[in-house]
A protein has these predicted regions:
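N-terminal hydrophobic or amphipathic helices/low-complexity stretches enriched
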Residues: 1-16
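N-terminal capping segment at the start of a domain
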Residues: 13-29, 177-179
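Cofactor-binding active-site loop characterized by glycine-rich and histidine/acidic residues
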Residues: 20-23, 35-166
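Glycine-rich beta-alpha junction loops
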Residues: 40, 71-72, 76, 179-180, ...
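Generic beta-sheet signal
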Residues: 63-65, 141-145, 172, 229-239
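Short acidic, glycine/serine/threonine-rich loops at helix termini
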Residues: 77-79, 106, 156-158, 184-188, ...
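Thiamine diphosphate
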Residues: 112, 116-119, 124-227
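Glycine/aspartate-rich loop-and-adjacent alpha/beta segment that forms the canonical ThDP
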Residues: 205, 215-283
Length: 283
């Protein structure tokens, strides 16, 4: 990947983070922490990797993206808006009465959303069904699903992993957001799921652990997924919850609340400065 390409993706990721802050500030609620930390992977999927068309969001031959950690909907909405599925201005209607941008993704109302999610563990299960369906149909469709590391405390995730392995779903890419925080504290103290890499390998997954904020690493890991033709892949994304907003970073306090006016102003100042630095670097 060239430096110019990485800069372009970094700008998209910055816009996604701005969208997260705009939406959760307007709503006065939501989940900014776990939304901010998946900006890079969403930017890469939406602008580089996935076969999608904002003008034809229901194309049966499109790749699929399932946000299994559905509470991170602000990031998914911001990414879809950035990609052109709907107006960026609509992000400010997040969680409002009458808005199509609900607190969790709704496949029946939001263009570009492939599965309604929110109940943890169910998204990855649906993604398995999509991948198996594509296999049976003989279609070259890849299915990507983003999970949280708190989410994998749900037993349904492991049933889905067993299913994916049993059916050899090599077209399924599980992207596990490993930020080590969940609503009640650290994942290590609430319910330690480590060692995740070894456990997933025992479930016969192709497993890679990468820096989830590094575009080169994301590109290489997805290339490894595409090269695998016998078993499902899990890319463990080592991330920083709240990435990009200093006072939200690595803080469980920002799992599930929106910024007030003062916090919003500070967050946007930081993100605008980050974007300006990218623009300067791109000259």
């Amino acid at each position: 990947m060239t430096n110019a390409e990485k800069l372009t993706l970094a700008k998209h990721a910055c816009h996604i983070r701005m969208g997260v802050i705009e939406g959760t500030h307007s709503a006065k609620c939501g989940h900014p922490g776990g939304s901010l930390d998946i900006a890079e992977v969403l930017a890469y999927l939406c602008f580089v990797e996935m076969k999608v068309d904002p003008k034809d969001p229901k194309n049966p031959d499109r790749d699929r993206l399932v946000l299994s950690k559905g509470h991170a909907a602000p990031a998914l909405y911001a990414a879809l808006a950035e990609r052109g599925f709907f107006p960026v201005e609509d992000l400010k209607t997040l969680r409002k009465i009458g808005s199509y941008l609900q607190g969790h993704p709704n496949m029946n109302s939001v263009p570009g959303v492939d599965m309604s999610t929110g109940s943890l563990g169910q998204g990855v299960s649906a993604a398995c069904g999509m991948a198996l369906g594509a296999k049976h149909a003989g279609k070259p469709i890849n299915v990507y699903t983003i999970l949280g590391d708190g989410e994998v405390e749900e037993g349904e995730c492991w049933e889905a992993f067993m299913f994916a392995s049993h059916y050899g779903l090599s077209n399924l890419c599980v992207m596990l957001d490993r930020n080590h925080l969940q609503i009640d504290g650290t994942t290590e103290t609430v319910m330690n799921s480590a060692p995740l890499e070894e456990k997933l390998k025992a479930f016969n997954f192709n497993v890679l652990t990468i820096n989830g904020h590094d575009f080169d690493a994301i590109e290489s890991a997805i290339a490894a997924f595409r090269a695998e033709n016998e078993k499902p892949t899990c890319i463990i994304l080592d991330t920083l919850k709240g990435k990009g907003v200093s006072f939200m970073e690595n803080s469980v306090d920002w799992h599930g609340k929106g910024p007030n006016d003062e916090e919003y102003a500070q967050a946007m100042q930081e993100l605008n400065a980050a974007y300006a630095a990218l623009e300067e670097e791109d000259k």
